[in-house]
Amino acid sequence: MGQYCVYPDVDLIEKYTGNILPVNLDAIKKFMIEKNVYHKLNDYIKASGDLAVKLYKEDIEAALRTKDFGGFELLSLSDYTGQSTATVGILDVFYESKGLISHDEFKNFAGEAVPLFKAKRIFKNTDTLEAELDLYDFGEKKINNPVYNLTVQNGKQVFYKTSTTESKVSIPLNSITKSTMLSVILEVNGYKNTWRIFVFAENKIENNVRMIKSEEELDDIIKNGGKAIVTKECFKNPIHGSFIPVFWSPVHFPSQKPCGAIIDNNHRIFDDFPTEKYPDYQWKRLLDNSIGTDISKFAGEVKPIIETVPNFFDNTASSPLFETEIGKAKLLFCGFDLDGDYPECKQLLSSITQYVNSDKF
């Protein structure tokens, strides 16, 4: 269970004051400087760590919500500097917190009693949110006939609230008119747990936006001018995306897989697509079907909207979504599969086309 690679904090070198020399961290730091990404170290740690915490939560809850399951085992929650450098911890090698999650937050999903909300993560606003409420209870004193206190918030507003002994709830979503992220809070006898649910409204696609899908079309717009979306067919030296990061170590199991992503979530391109700085499950299928390209070698100034966090054995500054101007053209390079038939893909396409067709671009 777990063992998701978190980008190593190479600045821990100064904490090694004994007999062990952190030659691995020293090599990684030199490689980062060589690839001109060392200044992004803190962002890389936070983004990859945020993803690792989300996945640990999902893994642990999957075990807890499985009937008659005998529990779970974690190899460790700290980094392991042996076996090719496995920086897989929520704690560093000195067993100190990386600041990714607090003790109380971790206990919400890995404690003696854990409220569970069994539901999908992605919905359309024409759907009804069907969820099962449950309680994993391994405490010394069992909670008989638990009362589930459920609150669903849309931003700061309460969207739905109930206190019930029933194990199932049905929540219509048709009052939601703009794609949004809902926060779910479930509390039982002082034990609390939280989740995020994404609801996508009917989307508007701007069909008059130019899509560049070939080198010939790209050369033409650069020469003659205009603005357009450049699709992944034009990405040179493509780097395949992935929501799930490298397992254990990219040295032990060679991989070009990234370790998360950093999103400019205040960018106007996301006016109609709910997101925060680091990806949640609304990005899973999108990232799994995406490609990026090495923006450090790109001609012209590049403004990344989404930047993937490379693994420390690769350190390529890659992006699946960025803006640039080349020649007379203003271009949005998009490595996502915009033809996908699922709500989050359609909504991303809608948000992107509306942005490109506006004076914001």
Go through each PLM region and give its residues.
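Local beta-strand/beta-hairpin segments that build beta-sheet-rich folds
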Residues: G155-F159, E166-K168, S179-M181, K192, ...
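Catalytic beta-strand/loop cores that center a nucleophilic Ser/Cys/Thr
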Residues: C234-I239, S249-E344
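Low-complexity, Pro/Ser/Thr- and charge-rich linker/hinge segments at domain boundaries
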Residues: W195-E215
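Beta-strand-rich binding/interaction modules
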Residues: T128-L173, S179-N189
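Solvent-exposed loop/turn segments at secondary-structure junctions
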Residues: G2-Y4, D79-Y80, E215-E217, C234-P238, ...
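Soluble or luminal CAZymes and related metallo-dependent hydrolases
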Residues: S48-L55, F312-D314, E344, L348
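Substrate-binding clefts and catalytic carboxylate motifs of secreted carbohydrate-active enzymes
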Residues: M1-P146, P304
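Short alpha-beta junction capping motif
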Residues: N208-P250, E325-C334, I352-Y355
